[in-house]
Amino acid sequence: PLFLVETMAPQLKITRLMCARQSFVKSRAPLEDNAFVLMEYDNGAVGSMWTSAVNSGAMHSQKVRIVGEKASIEWWDEHPNQLSYEVQGEPARILERGMPYLSPNALADDRIGGGHPEGLFEAWSNLYRRFAIAMDAADRRDEALLADFWYPDARAGAFGVRWVENCVRSADNGAC
């Protein structure tokens, strides 16, 4: 889920978070099957992330919402090809994957064009493709490409582990 948050708003840095987690299915305890995370960012924006394996009607749901001063964005894995973009005082806009109005970065991992749903295999394929591009650039010492090329590297993995640890610490301390 953190990967989704970072992909949606890579320029934002999380400064504070608060987590609540639950184990609704007792046989899964002590592992949680539902969690809510509230996040504050360095520019004053706030975000929320909800992940659940028990939300009736939404199997293994993950929802990410980031709220800023002027606009909000929301992504939900039940509608993975859509991103809701909501500007204050305007109707919500649904941005569809693969459409020409998206930025080149948004289109870079599009495999089969808009209107056709992509899935888990394409997502993994995109990650492996990005790893391969980064490894090739590193072998060629192409610092220019690596400076602007985003992929989940070891730093992202370590940050993700720290993020989960902070979520656990927050929930264990009864932050909610």
Per-region residue spans from a language model:
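Alpha-helical scaffold segments in carbohydrate-active enzymes
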Residues: G160-C167
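Rossmann-like dinucleotide-binding domain that binds NAD(P)(H)
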Residues: P1-V46, W50-M59, R155
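C-terminal capping/lid region of NAD(P)-dependent oxidoreductase domains
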Residues: R169-C176
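C-terminal glycine/acidic-rich active-site capping loop/insertion
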Residues: F36, Y41, K70-R155
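A general structural signal for well-ordered alpha-helical segments in protein cores
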Residues: P1, Y128-A132, V164
